[in-house]
Amino acid sequence: MRIVLLSIICLFFTCRVEKRYENLNLTDYQKQVNNYFKDASVSPLKPRDLKNFKGLDFFEFDSLYVVYAKIQETPESLPFKMKTTTDIPAHVRKYGDLFFQIIDKEFELTVYENLEYDGVEGYENYLFLPFLDQTNGNETYGGGRYIDLYQYDNDSILIDFNRAYNPQCAYDENFSCPIVPRKNFLNTRIEAGVKNFIKN
C-alpha cells in the first residue's frame, strides 16, 4: 500500500503549476477525468470495476461553488502526521485557514501542505484541501472529498468545488488516504464535483 495524497493532481493534468486558473469546459474536464479512470495503467479502479466502467457521476457545474477565499496563513505551524485509512500517516503541515461565502453563508476550512513534496519542482504552490459536507454518505463518498489548490496571491485563493474529487480509497480500499479532519466539515450541501462511486 502507498500513500495517495497527490496522485489525483496528475489525474487532473495539473502536475505542473499553472500560472493562472484555467476554467475548463465541464465536458472537457469530465472527459479528462474519465479517460484517466479508463486507463488500466493508472486507474485506481479494481479490475472488475474497470471492466464495466462507463464514467464517473458528477453534479452539474454550478458557478455558486466557485469562490474566492481569504487566506490566513499560519507560518508558525509545525509538521505533523495526518491520520489515513491505513497505518501509514501522511506528513503534512497546516498552511492556513480559508474564509469564504457560499450563498451568503460564512464558512471556514483549514488547508494543508504535503511535506513529502517539499522542494519538488512543479509543486511549489500546491495546497491540499480535504472537506466534509452534508452530501457525504448520500450523493457523495462518506469519507469526504478533496480539492487541489494553488496559491499565488498572499491574500486570497480560488476554490472550485466543481473539481472536488473522491479519495482513491473510495475506489479501492487498499489505497492509503488522508482522513478528513472533522473541523473541515461544512454544514451545508456542496452539490458540486464528483459523486459517490457505486462498485460492482
Language-model features: where?
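Extended, aromatic/histidine-rich regions of cofactor-dependent oxidoreductases associated
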Residues: Y165-N200
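Start-of-domain marker
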Residues: E18-S77
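Bacterial Sec-dependent N-terminal signal peptides
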Residues: M1-L24
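Mid-length scaffold segments of soluble, non-membrane domains
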Residues: L78-G142
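Terminal leader/tail segments of proteins
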Residues: S63-Y65, P79-T84, Y152, N200
